[in-house]
Amino acid sequence: MADEFLVVGQVVAAQGLKGEVRILPASDFPQRFTEPGSRWLRRRGHNEQQVQLLSGRQLPGKELFVVRFEGINDRTAAESLVHQEFLVAADDIPELEDGEFHVRDLQGLSVRLDTESDPIGVVVDLHHGGNDLLEIELKADGRRCLVPFVDAIVPQVELEEGWLLITPPKGLLDG
């Protein structure tokens, strides 16, 4: 059941000879890759397979984690996991600080230029990086644009009401 799980990363390569794999994270919560416990792997078009995470560490200077799973003890076994999605249970939601949001809470929010106006678009995704970027689909022409998710440009997020306010600099939304 797809809605029972959250995709938090992807296995991108085997690491060494002892069965470790590299995971590219799609989550801001490193404990999902370092704390032992149940996780799931899923190859596209297949069902989830439960695995036990034994250990994990972040590669210094990289946005990659190296993890070890129970029963994966050599490079051949590790290579068989490449391209699989790394999942956690959907109810495994870490506590957030004020001003932090889960991607799934932002997706679908209406985007407004002021608190009284009609929406100009909808949030379709959040891209992580040096600064997170909201991907917004504009109502006027269906175009998608990226908006820096920083207080100066997105000063207000109203999850309960289903919208957020943006104050884009001139040209940011232009085609």
UniProtKB/Swiss-Prot annotation:
SUPFAM superfamilies: PRC-barrel domain, Translation proteins. Residues 98-172 form the PRC barrel domain. Keywords: Chaperone, Cytoplasm, Ribosome biogenesis, rRNA processing. Signal peptide: none annotated. InterPro entries: PRC_barrel-like_sf (IPR011033), PRC_RimM (IPR056792), RimM (IPR011961), RimM_N (IPR002676), RimM_N_sf (IPR036976), Transl_B-barrel_sf (IPR009000). Its main location: cytoplasm. Binds ribosomal protein uS19. This is Ribosome maturation factor RimM. The lineage of its organism: Bacteria, Bacillati, Cyanobacteriota, Cyanophyceae, Synechococcales. The gene is rimM.
